[in-house]
Amino acid sequence: MKMIGIAFLCAGALLAQDGGEKATVPLTDPSRPAHIRVHLIQGGITVRGANIKNVVVEARERPDGESRESRPAAAAGMKRLDLPNNAGLDVVEEDNVVNIKTASWNQPSDLVITVPQRSSLQLKCLNNGDIYVENVDGEIDADDLNGKVTLKNVSGSVVAHSLNGAVHVSLDQVDPSKPMSFSTLNGDIDVTLPDTVKANVRMKTDNGEIYSDFDVKLDAGGPSSLSASGRRPDGSYHLHFDRSLHGTINGGGPEFQFTSYNGQIYIHKK
């Protein structure tokens, strides 16, 4: 196992740069795809695929921006001694799996990560940042609580979710054996798929419209179909009608789900 951690001492493949940090992480077996896992409490994640054999991680903590009004009364007339403006980057690599996190809980830290093009990603942001990915071929799982998710020119399979942000995905190629999911509570979903894609689609928005470039063959059940029924333990009989649309693209395939509560759904043909 290789571990690279950032503190006030620098070693090997780790550099401190003007309030930021940069680490070059060798993979155990560069001939195999990498698996990148990132979890940020505060900040955004950018991942770019490239023709490289290692993983390069750059972290930068955003400026504090303290105002005079935020100083304690007891500090009047005193000079503030700033703590090092670094994100506390921590990177661990084991058997081509790279786990990345920062020690910054209160101050947002933005990560820019360059990976081999054939990589799988698990990305999670909670606050004060967006997720952006481009030119990556693999399984991508992107989850942003309070920001938008953008995946550009990616291939493979995607699970993309945002609670309070838009989801924009452009796929060059899809894995024909994998299901996919695109969802948001408050935001639009905009997905571009290859024109030859085969999929069973399930689409639902409570407060929006659904638009598609594809000729979606809708199931005969119509816009509202019975999804659950039966007698409950208290003796009452329950019927539930699902408001989602079900259909197929190009004859059907793995299931693709598109779900928004407050937003439009756009399905484009590449």
Segments and roles (model prediction):
Residues 7-16:
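Hydrophobic h-region of N-terminal signal peptides that target proteins for export
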Residues 151-152, 160-163, 169-170:
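Solenoidal tandem-repeat scaffolds enriched in leucines and small polar residues
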Residues 16-126, 134-135, 141-143, 158-159, ...:
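Acidic (Asp/Glu) and glycine-rich low-complexity loops/linkers
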Residues 152-153, 178:
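Long amphipathic alpha-helical scaffold regions
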Residues 1-7:
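Positively charged n-region of N-terminal signal peptides that target proteins for export
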Residues 62, 129, 138, 147, ...:
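Hydrophobic lipid-interacting interfaces of membrane-associated proteins
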